[in-house]
Amino acid sequence: MAGNNSNGGTRKASKSKGKIVIFAIEILLILIMLAILFLVMTKSGEGPKVVDLNTEDLGINEISKTDSTGANAGGQNGADGTQVIDTGYLNVALFGVDATTPNGLFKGSRSDCIMVASVNKNTGDIKLVSVYRDTYLNLGTDTYNKCNHAYAGGGAEQAIKMLNMNLDLDITNFIAVNYQSLIDLVDGLGGIYVDVNKNELKHINNYQITINKDLNLGGYTAVKETGYQKLNGLQATAYCRVRYDLPGGDFDRASNQREVIKAIEEQAKKTDPATLTKVFNKVVDEIYTSISSKDLLDLVTNINGYSIVDEGGFPEESMRTTGNIGAKGSCVIPVDLESNVVWLHKFLFDDADYAVSNTVKECGAKIKSDTSSYINKR
């Protein structure tokens, strides 16, 4: 599984910010499913906070290169030789933002969890990729910094543009949540099952104390042993926060977050429709998205028709390093952006012959120029 481990030094790539980090990806898949159930069963037009995005402002790169056969490399070939979007996949950006109020979902909050969920609409297979929050990338404004700054500067639109420009993706939809969503979702499902190891155990309860205080939840239940066990919403959120004493630090934390998604999917498939509807009613006000009810209805008709089949992290483990980039602090650095993007398209779309856009080449050259003198200097 790509991107799950790293050497011990990589844990320095992420600093403690003394705040609760939110994990949108843990709830993306199930929120879509719950939205369908809610809209169908109650026939209500109410739902998440929805925004319309202009696709022309989302930084979708033009691909004009062709391979030796004349077919477009990395996508379907249009009449003019440029890439056209492969409608067999739906790519959705997922943001967890450090917002403590509903308005913080719109702009001004950093996205401390960034993921891409790619859904194969023909098979129902879903692949998940974490984009590590401290990755040094073009923010969509020709400014380079940690990629989680994009959401703070221009909200979801700029964050999507950042992903599309740097990764040659065609994302036009997103879901963003605040931190209360994960707690409410897991509790509504009756808890989820994960395997807690000894390094994680000693930090879960400390994070529970902090989260309980910040959210004024009125108490917490300590996790007392290691092993495969049921966690409630607060415990699961604390589990997603743990990175200290993990061999890969923040990289292993991102892997744990993806494990939580799979646990939520598994639990949701065992839950009756009436309970799922109640859960959606609970979390609906904590969601900000571009996905309309019609698109949701077109996408999802049967919860059992979708399966998470693979997951990984970007930059890929063998093609990343870390470095303190001056005033920008400790960053995750794609050693070669072009190679990482080729890997990403092979991983998500089984495209073995992908050729990156000129935009990715330009971004990669700038990243190398900015970071070469800082790499591995702690």
Predicted regions: what they are:
Residues 2-13, 17-378:
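Non-catalytic, solvent-exposed segments at the cell envelope interface
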